[in-house]
Amino acid sequence: MSIPTMQWAQVAEKVGGPLVYKQIPVPKPGPDQILVKIRYSGVCHTDLHAMMGHWPIPVKMPLVGGHEGAGIVVAKGELVHEFEIGDQAGIKWLNGSCGECEFCRQSDDPLCARAQLSGYTVDGTFQQYALGKASHASKIPAGVPLDAAAPVLCAGITVYKGLKEAGVRPGQTVAIVGAGGGLGSLAQQYAKAMGIRVVAVDGGDEKRAMCESLGTETYVDFTKSKDLVADVKAATPDGLGAHAVILLAVSEKPFQQATEYVRSRGTIVAIGLPPDAYLKAPVINTVVRMITIKGSYVGNRQDGVEALDFFARGLIKAPFKTAPLKDLPKIYELMEQGRIAGRYVLEMPE
């Protein structure tokens, strides 16, 4: 398989951008790595945070962002046995980990202190060819469309893990805050596939239409609701509130409201990462109602296998729009304005 020496990529040359669409060298895989010809890459809010330096974690610069890359294996290191040339593969947020620490040994490899993060500490998938450690790359079954699979590699795995962390059971209700975004659209479907009832919380008629098309039972529009807490509680069958709340919002206020409409003994799972935000909860209310508040990061390798299996069986469809790689700056603008329903997937130039 012929591999060029140069490729097109979107590169942030300094924190805060701007992005530069230019040619850069094609990397060569190390002994335990695969080189993937990226066909499609999803665009996540994390990619924008990385470029802007919003988080207190040092970010590589210059940086090729992206961590939802789906494509074909075109080269591999001599130690790689998991993949063959021509296999479909996905490169995720967790590009690699040490494999030796306590967290890696107990399958909490996302918590590894030496984890390598695609599009953050190592170059990611907004380029035609990207590297990934073979043990952390995902196998995408043959016949599964790569454009539709791309958002599952981060958004899908992340919300699937969050639902598992919430401990919510079939027949119970989950409130998904930020339901109309890329993560939320997938969270609704995973919840439904797991037999969980959904109250979708977001703003705007376009997001309402999308959520209703995904089968949500109730949509609460925070831009129109006079009493969001009452509306979420009223949407649950017994009026006692949601058994779990999945927080995917990118602003702070929803993180402060969640304890008001989660039911007693309920669980609040924080996944969204608004910059400089804090979680605050009244202590007495949290204690006497036995509310659990926890964070959920990305899934481990097994979570990735399970999340992709839901997709391969046709239980999950990622609502997405396709755009060329050169349009990434426009997509970031829409993202900053909160005007994206579902997910954007970038198509790489041939």
Curated annotation (Swiss-Prot):
For the ligand (Zn(2+) 1), the binding residues are C44, T46, H67, C154
**Where mainly found?**
cytoplasm
Q: How is the cofactor bound?
A: Binds 2 Zn(2+) ions per subunit.
| Similarity comment: family membership | Belongs to the zinc-containing alcohol dehydrogenase family.
Which reaction(s) does the protein catalyse, per the Swiss-Prot or TrEMBL entry? Answer: a primary alcohol + NAD(+) = an aldehyde + NADH + H(+); a secondary alcohol + NAD(+) = a ketone + NADH + H(+)
What gene is behind this protein? alcA
Among InterPro entries, the record links this protein to: ADH-like_C, ADH-like_N, ADH_Zn_CS, GroES-like_sf, NAD(P)-bd_dom_sf, PKS_ER, Rhodanese-like_dom
Protein name, please?
Alcohol dehydrogenase 1
Keyword ATP-binding part of the UniProt annotation: no
The species this protein was found in:
Emericella nidulans (strain FGSC A4 / ATCC 38163 / CBS 112.46 / NRRL 194 / M139)
